[in-house]
UniProtKB/Swiss-Prot annotation:
This is Cytochrome b. The lineage of its organism: Eukaryota, Metazoa, Chordata, Craniata, Vertebrata. The cytochrome bc1 complex contains 11 subunits: 3 respiratory subunits (MT-CYB, CYC1 and UQCRFS1), 2 core proteins (UQCRC1 and UQCRC2) and 6 low-molecular weight proteins (UQCRH/QCR6, UQCRB/QCR7, UQCRQ/QCR8, UQCR10/QCR9, UQCR11/QCR10 and a cleavage product of UQCRFS1). This cytochrome bc1 complex then forms a dimer. Keywords: Electron transport, Heme, Iron, Membrane, Metal-binding, Mitochondrion, Mitochondrion inner membrane, Respiratory chain, Transmembrane, Transmembrane helix, Transport, Ubiquinone. It is found in: Mitochondrion inner membrane. The keyword RNA-binding does not apply. The keyword Oxidoreductase does not apply. Component of the ubiquinol-cytochrome c reductase complex (complex III or cytochrome b-c1 complex) that is part of the mitochondrial respiratory chain. The b-c1 complex mediates electron transfer from ubiquinol to cytochrome c. Contributes to the generation of a proton gradient across the mitochondrial membrane that is then used for ATP synthesis.
Length: 379
């Protein structure tokens, strides 16, 4: 009798994805982040579900309901902080996952890569709307500033903003719809993540060398299940250290002040994981130009396969490209730092230089380095 996991219609799907899946024998810990993202998503959906049971999406009671969750609901404080810091862990894993894809040339799998970029956009949208829900000062003003950017779109901009707001300012209608979208989007993300996996399993995983590993595969279980379990334990360790020892480390103190449309905070800034894009937005003195640069800073990932000039897939054996990749990583850290600083000298010029450097590295320097490396191979 054949094994049930190989014949049962449902178990067969799980088996082919997580048990008998042929995986390259040499994938490193950089390949752990996919499963960690899955864990983050499940964690966010579960904690979010319990928060939604006690949250009220009304401008008058939203802030109080979050306070009530932390003070009066059994273990409400830990659920709330796991959800808030879980988002930070989610984005750390996302950035690592995308960085891995860039370094090892995983973007050559076009469908998988493009669905991944869609997932990134959707996760960013979900996180933004979630940040609005506690209805603190930074929630309100963050929502006002970011939604207002759409008014830069010619002709339809103003109508579009008022349509999203559901009125003439960020108010009850906005909060209610943001809660509705924030609730539904993670389930859509989960569905698209399944499609992401489906396309990945059509081709099989990439590996650090960037060379086909068809001749050297090992079963996913037990080798990578145990490896992913270690990654998951480390993820939970870091998350719980944050939650239990420094729950507000990555938050903004302004969000402990209830939203007040009559009082603007001195420095409006988003959560840390959006600061790099926010810095790029602020570095351009024109509104429409800034919005375009903001969108392009993420959308540029779609063009990575077109910008791939190297004869090798991975950066493993390309020292010049490696150097530029780590300069890009440092540049993103610089932009993240600048995004959290006030708009004054010297931060303005640093932000502008870092923004120029970001696009220059991706669009010009890295393709040039690839071409140079191709020519060096001929020697």
């Amino acid at each position: 009798m054949t094994n049930m996991r190989k014949t049962h219609p449902l178990m067969k799907i799980v088996n082919n994805a997580f048990i008998d899946l042929p995986a390259p024998s040499n994938i490193s810990s950089w390949w752990n982040f996919g499963s960690l993202l899955g864990i983050c998503l499940i964690l966010q959906i579960l904690t979010g579900l319990f928060l939604a049971m006690h949250y009220t999406s009304d401008t008058i009671t939203a802030f109080s309901s979050v306070t009530h969750i932390c003070r009066d609901v059994n273990y409400g404080w830990i659920i709330r902080y796991m959800h808030a810091n879980g988002a930070s862990m989610f984005f750390i894993c996302l950035f690592m996952h995308v960085g891995r894809g860039l370094y090892y040339g995983s973007y050559i799998f076009l469908e998988t890569w493009n669905i991944g970029v869609i997932l990134l956009f959707m996760t960013m949208a979900t996180a933004f709307m979630g940040y609005v829900l506690p209805w603190g000062q930074m929630s309100f003003w963050g929502a006002t500033v970011i939604t207002n950017l759409l008014s830069a779109i010619p002709y339809i901009g103003t109508n579009l903003v008022e349509w999203i707001w559901g009125g003439f300012s960020v108010d009850k209608a906005t909060l209610t719809r943001f809660f509705a979208f924030h609730f539904i989007l993670p389930f859509i993300i989960a569905a698209i993540a399944m499609v992401h996996l489906l396309f990945l399993h059509e081709t099989g995983s990439n590996n650090p060398t960037g060379i086909s590993s068809d001749t050297d595969k090992i079963p996913f279980h037990p080798y990578y299940t145990i490896k992913d379990t270690l990654g998951a334990l480390l993820l939970i360790l870091v998350l719980m250290l944050l939650v239990l020892f420094a729950p507000d480390l990555l938050g903004d103190p302004d969000n402990y002040t209830p939203a007040n449309p009559l009082n603007t905070p001195p420095h409006i800034k988003p959560e840390w994981y959006f600061l790099f894009a926010y810095a790029i937005l602020r570095s351009i003195p024109n509104k429409l130009g800034g919005v375009l640069a903001l969108v392009l800073s993420i959308l540029i990932l779609v063009f990575m396969p077109l910008l791939h000039m190297s004869k090798q897939r991975s950066m493993m054996f390309r020292p010049i490209s490696q150097c530029l990749f780590w300069i890009l990583a440092a540049d993103l850290l610089t932009l993240t730092w600048i995004g959290g600083q006030p708009v004054e000298h010297p931060y303005i010029i640093i932000g502008q230089l870092a923004s120029i450097m970001y696009f220059l590295l991706i669009l010009v320097l890295m393709p040039m380095a690839s071409t140079i490396e191709n020519n060096l191979l001929k020697w």
